Amino acid sequence: MFVGKYKDFPKIDMTQSGAKGAVKQVVVGPEQGWEDYVLRVITLDVDGYSPTHTHDWPHINYVISGTGVVMISGQEYPVEQGTCAYVPSNEEHCFINKGDVPLELICIVPLRGEA
């Protein structure tokens, strides 16, 4: 069992090529007893974005706060607090903060997707 606040977890700069103003926090994973998946919180600063990329696993996202877009295979979808997004395997994607406050979102991936 595990109970905690995501704000208490260390922030890790996302330094991949194509990222700007992006950090992640690994909140739930094997250390908390979830062996097969990882729940991360991604924060994008104003004008920040995650790298455009693809991979062979899907992921699920939920927007905690802020506004922006998720790009999936060249299609732009607006996101705001309360928006869910499912990104299928092998679809090119990224998140972009289009608002005037940080964009915070939950990102759930299989364990192999946490690098």
Segments the model singles out, each with a brief description of its role:
Residues 58-68, 73:
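Glycine- and acidic-residue-biased ligand/ion/polar-headgroup-sensing regions
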